[in-house]
C-alpha cells in the first residue's frame, strides 16, 4: 500500500513519490516565452487543480468516512447452544424410584435460535420454562426415559467486522473468521458443532455505521470528472483512483488513501486486495484547516504582491515567486529577461526533495535536464547566486511544509481487524467455559418409597404397619407356647402305661386307677 495523506492532493498530489508530500512544484513542461504587460499578471487558484482542463465546478453530494472513526467495527451477536436433557427413572418392587439426569447436545436451527433470542430479550416466560429439566415420569418395575430440548442463548457475543470483505472475526469462529453471513445464511458456525453464532440485527450493514454525507464541488470537463473540492475546501483528484467496497458500499480509493463514494462516469479499475484506506480523524481535519489557511494566506500574499506591482509599475524576481502555482496541474510561469516581463504556459509537477530539481551546483532540472538561465535568471523568482548556487525563495519558507509533515504523520491506515488465527479452543475446560450452559449438572437422585401419599400420611402408614407387625409377632409367639404345652403332657402319660399308682382317700395304696375304681365299687 502507498498511504498518502488525503489532504494536499492539490499541493502535494499527483505525486509519484511513493506517498511523500511534495515541498515544491516546478514545471515539467514549459512552453515558449512571450513578452507581456504587467496587467496580464494573475494569481493562480491553488485551491483547485486545473489539470486536464477540468475547470467546471458544480455542487454535489458525496459520502466519506466519519471523523473519529475507529478501525474496529463491533458487531453485537449471541451464541445459541442446543441442549437435550434426559431424565431416566426406574421403580423397583417396593416402590423406590431412582431418577438419573443426563445432558447431551444437538445443532440448533437458525430460526429456532432467533425465536429463543426474541423470547429472552422480551422477557417471555417461555424461554425460562424451556430451560427447566423435564418432569420425570415413572411406572412400577419399569425404566422410563423423558427428554426435553432447550436452546441456551448467551449474549452479548461481540465480533469484529472487516469493512473490506464483510467478514467477521472472533475467537469463537473456526480459524477466527466467519465469511458465511449473507441474505440467505444469517449465522456462523463456531468451534463447537452444537453452537452457532448469530448477529443481534438481521441487517448486518447497520453495524457498519462509519459513513457520513458531505457537500462539495465537482470539477469536470463535459462528462468527465477530474476531481472535486471537498467540504473543507481542498481539491482531490480522481487520477489514479481505484474502486473499493467498504461494508458493501462501492466507492473510490484516491491516491492519497482517501475513500469517497460519488457518482462518476469514469472507467475505474478495482483496487488490488492489499489496498487499504486511511482513517478520517480529527487531527487530520485540523491540519487540513491549517493548510487551507496557509493556502489562503499565500493567495493574499500573491494579491498583495500583484497590487504592489501594478501600483508601482515595477516588478522584481522575488515578487514573481508569489505567482507560482502551488499545486500540480496547468498554470503560468513568469520571468524577466533583459528587463522584459515574460510569460509561458507550464504544467507543474510535485517535488519531494530539493535534490530532485537541484542535482548539482548551478543546475535547475526541468523536464529531465538542466534548464538554461539567462544572465543568472531562471523563472518564478529562481536565480543563480553569486557563488553559482541555485537560489529558490521558497526554500526559506518552511511553515507550509511543517503543516504537510504533520498531516503525513497523522495518516492512520484502516487495517483489517484480524483476530489471532491461532487462538482456537483446544482444551476441554476452555470449551466448557465458552458454552456456559446454565443448566444443572448431570446428577442422580434416589427418592424414598413413593406410594402417592403426602409425607405425614407416609409416617402414619409406616407407624401403623410397624405396630401391626409387632402385634402379629406377639400373637404368634403366644400361640406357639400354648400349642407346645399340651403336647408335652400327653407324651409323658403315654410313656408310663399302667404303672401308674394313686393313693385313695382312706390312705390305702392303690396300684392303679382300675384297682381304685373296683375297690370303690366294692365299698359302695
Curated annotation (Swiss-Prot):
It is found in: Virion membrane. One of its GO terms (cellular component) is viral membrane. A lipid is attached at residue 480 (S-palmitoyl cysteine). Changing residue 183 to R: In strain: RC_HL. The chain crosses the membrane at residues 460-480. Residues 20-459 are virion surface. Changing residue 219 to V: In strain: RC_HL. It is a single-pass type I membrane protein. Changing residue 201 to I: In strain: Ni-CE and RC_HL. Changing residue 511 to N: In strain: RC_HL. The keyword Oxidoreductase does not apply. Primary surface antigen capable of inducing and reacting with virus-neutralizing antibodies. Almost all human and veterinary vaccines are based on the functional aspects of the G protein. Keywords: Disulfide bond, Glycoprotein, Lipoprotein, Membrane, Palmitate, Signal, Transmembrane, Transmembrane helix, Viral envelope protein, Virion. Pfam families: PH_Rhabdo_glycop, Rhabdo_glycop_CD, Rhabdo_glycop_FD. Residues 1-19 form the signal peptide. Its main location: virion. Glycosylated and palmitoylated by host. Glycosylation is crucial for glycoprotein export at the cell surface. SUPFAM superfamilies: Viral glycoprotein ectodomain-like (SSF161008). Changing residue 322 to H: In strain: RC_HL. InterPro entries: PH_Rhabdo_glycop, Rhabdo_glycop_CD, Rhabdo_glycop_FD. Attaches the virus to host cellular receptor, inducing endocytosis of the virion by using different host proteins including TFRC, GRM2 and ITGB1. In the endosome, the acidic pH induces conformational changes in the glycoprotein trimer, which trigger fusion between virus and cell membrane. There is convincing in vitro evidence that the muscular form of the nicotinic acetylcholine receptor (nAChR), the neuronal cell adhesion molecule (NCAM), and the p75 neurotrophin receptor (p75NTR) bind glycoprotein and thereby facilitate rabies virus entry into cells. Homotrimer. Interacts with matrix protein. Interacts with host TRFC. Interacts with host BST2; this interaction inhibits viral budding by tethering new virions to the cell surface. Interacts with ITGB1. Interacts with host GRM2. Arg-352 is highly involved in rabies virus pathogenicity. Its mutation dramatically attenuates the virus. This is Glycoprotein.
